Curated annotation (Swiss-Prot):
Belongs to the binding-protein-dependent transport system permease family. UgpAE subfamily. Pfam families: BPD_transp_1. The keyword Cell membrane applies. It is found in: Cell inner membrane. The complex is composed of two ATP-binding proteins (UgpC), two transmembrane proteins (UgpA and UgpE) and a solute-binding protein (UgpB). The lineage of its organism: Bacteria, Pseudomonadati, Pseudomonadota, Gammaproteobacteria, Enterobacterales. This is sn-glycerol-3-phosphate transport system permease protein UgpA. It is a multi-pass membrane protein. It comes from Salmonella typhi. One of its GO terms (biological process) is transmembrane transport. Part of the ABC transporter complex UgpBAEC involved in sn-glycerol-3-phosphate (G3P) import. Probably responsible for the translocation of the substrate across the membrane. GO terms for cellular component: plasma membrane. Keywords: Cell inner membrane, Cell membrane, Membrane, Transmembrane, Transmembrane helix, Transport.
Length: 295
C-alpha cells in the first residue's frame, strides 16, 4: 500500500517552510500573551517604568469589581446574539440565493458588499440611520409611535451594536454558506424532490446536515469575531454606553489600559478573556464537533 505522505529531499526543508509562520506566531501571538500574563501579576506604574510583583491580587480585585462583572455578562450576551443571529441570517440569505435561478449573480454581489466596509464605517453608517433627531429609520419608527434614542436606552444601544456587528459579518458567513450549498450534488437534491420532499424539507433533511462542517467552522469564527473584532463597532456607535450597557470585555480592556492607564488591571482582564475564549473553543471542539460528520 503506497503512502501519500510527502517526502522531502532535505530533512531541513519542512522546518524551513514552517519557520516564517512560526516566527509570526511567536512575535504576534505567544510573546504578547506572555507579556500580558507577566504584567497581570505585577503592579505597574502608568508609564511602565517600574513594577512590583503582587501575585494574584489583580485577579482578586477584578472579580470583586461590579463593573467588570457587568462587562463579563454583557460580553456573554452580546457574543451569543452576534454569533447566532449572524449565522441564522446569513444561512437564510444563502439558502434563498441558492434557491433563486434568475438574478442569483446580482444577489450574490449585493450580499458581499458589507464585507468591503470597515467595522467603524459600518457603525457610523447605522448611527446616521438610527440618529434620534434626523435618522431615516428613527423617523420611520416615530411614525408608528416608537421613540428611539440609543444614547439613553440601554436596550436600544445593545440592539444597535448587535445589528451593526451582524450586518458587517453577514458577507463572510454568506460566502461560506453559499459555497457549501452550491457544493451539494444536484443529483441528491433532484432525488429528494422526486421523492416528494418540498424545498423546506429538503433544506432541513438534506442540505443542513451536509453543510454541518462549514457551520461548525463559522461558529468558531463568529464567536472569536464577537469577542474581539467588534471593538470598532462599539467604540464608534456607543463608546460602551449608556451607563456601560454595551461595554464588553475587549472594550473594558481598552478603557482600563489606554484611558485609565491601569496596565496591570488591563493585562489581568486580557488574560481572563484569553482563557475564556480558549475554554469556549475547546468546549465547541469537544461537544459540538462530535456531532459533525465529515465526508
Amino acid at each position: 500500500m503506497s503512502s501519500s505522505r510527502p517526502v522531502f529531499r532535505s530533512r531541513w526543508l519542512p522546518y524551513l517552510l514552517v519557520a516564517p509562520q512560526l516566527v509570526i506566531t511567536v512575535i504576534f501571538f505567544i510573546w504578547p500573551a506572555g507579556e500580558a500574563l507577566w504584567y497581570s501579576l505585577q503592579s505597574v506604574d502608568p508609564f511602565g517604568f517600574s513594577s512590583q510583583f503582587v501575585g494574584l491580587e489583580n485577579f482578586v480585585a477584578l472579580f470583586h469589581d461590579s463593573y467588570y462583572l457587568d462587562a463579563f455578562w454583557t460580553t456573554i450576551k452580546f457574543s451569543a446574539l452576534v454569533t447566532f443571529s449572524g449565522l441564522l441570517v446569513s444561512l437564510f440569505f444563502a439558502a434563498l440565493v441558492d434557491y433563486v435561478v434568475r438574478g442569483s449573480r446580482f444577489y450574490q454581489t449585493l450580499m458581499l458588499l458589507p464585507y468591503a466596509v470597515a467595522p467603524a464605517v459600518a457603525a457610523v453608517l447605522w448611527i446616521f440611520l438610527f440618529n434620534p433627531g434626523r435618522g431615516l429609520i428613527t423617523h420611520f419608527l416615530g411614525e408608528f409611535g416608537y421613540d428611539w434614542n440609543h444614547a439613553q436606552n440601554s436596550g436600544q444601544a445593545m440592539f444597535l451594536v448587535v445589528f451593526a456587528s451582524v450586518w458587517k459579518q453577514i458577507s463572510y458567513n454568506f460566502l461560506f454558506f453559499f459555497a457549501a450549498l452550491q457544493s451539494i450534488p444536484r443529483s441528491l437534491v433532484e432525488a429528494a424532490a422526486i421523492d416528494g420532499a418540498g424545498p423546506i424539507r429538503r433544506f432541513f433533511r438534506l442540505s443542513l446536515p451536509l453543510i454541518a462542517p462549514v457551520s461548525f467552522f463559522l461558529l468558531v469564527v463568529n464567536l472569536v469575531y464577537a469577542f474581539f473584532d467588534t471593538f470598532p463597532v462599539i467604540d464608534a456607535a456607543t463608546a460602551g454606553g449608556p451607563v456601560q450597557a454595551t461595554t464588553t470585555l475587549i472594550y473594558k480592556i481598552y478603557c482600563e489600559g489606554f484611558t485609565g492607564l491601569d496596565l496591570s488591571a488591563s493585562a489581568a482582564q486580557s488574560v481572563v478573556l484569553m482563557f475564556l475564549v480558549i475554554i469556549l473553543t475547546v468546549v465547541q471542539f469537544r461537544y459540538v464537533e462530535s456531532k459533525v460528520r465529515y465526508q
